[in-house]
C-alpha cells in the first residue's frame, strides 16, 4: 500500500466497481481477472470488503468454481488481459479459451446478476493476436 506496480496505481476495474457500489446500483460484485499478472492492486483495494470477491484466473476449472460460489453477486466485472495467450507472454490460453471465458461470464451474469457484467481492457502485448482474442471474448459475451 506504500508503493505501486504501474497498472495498479490507476486501477480501472476497482474505480468502476467502487463507483457502482457507491451509486447503489450493485452491492455484491465478483471480479474475474484474466490478465497474466496478478491484480495485487485490485486484491488489496477490496481485501477487507466481503461484498467484493476477486479471482485471478489460473485455469478454466478454477473460474467455474469461483463463479459457482458467487451466485449471490449483482455484477461480474472482468479485468480483461490477453497476455495469457499461447502467442503472448503467458503461453497458456488459446483464442477459443477467451470465447469460453466470455460465455461462462455471460451465462453466470444472465442467471444470477440480471445480465449485468462488463469488462475493461488490461494487458496484451502481441498485437498480431490481441485483436482476435478481444473479439473472441466479446463473441463469448454475446448470448444471442
Regions found by a protein language model. Name each.
Residues 1-144:
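A general "terminal functional-core" signal
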Amino acid at each position: 500500500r506504500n508503493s505501486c506496480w504501474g497498472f495498479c496505481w490507476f486501477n480501472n476495474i476497482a474505480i468502476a466497481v467502487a463507483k457502482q457500489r457507491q451509486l447503489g446500483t450493485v452491492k455484491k460484485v465478483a471480479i474475474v481477472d484474466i490478465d497474466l499478472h496478478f491484480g495485487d492492486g485490485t486484491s488489496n483495494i477490496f481485501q477487507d470488503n466481503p461484498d467484493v470477491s476477486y479471482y485471478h484466473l489460473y485455469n478454466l476449472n478454477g473460474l467455474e468454481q469461483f463463479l459457482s460460489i458467487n451466485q449471490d453477486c449483482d455484477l461480474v466485472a472482468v479485468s480483461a488481459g490477453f497476455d495469457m495467450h499461447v502467442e503472448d507472454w503467458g503461453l497458456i490460453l488459446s483464442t477459443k479459451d477467451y470465447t469460453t471465458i466470455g460465455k461462462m461470464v455471460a451465462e453466470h451474469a444472465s442467471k444470477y446478476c440480471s445480465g449485468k457484467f462488463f469488462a475493461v481492457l488490461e494487458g496484451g502485448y502481441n498485437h498480431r493476436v490481441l485483436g482476435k482474442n478481444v473479439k473472441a471474448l466479446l463473441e463469448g459475451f454475446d448470448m444471442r
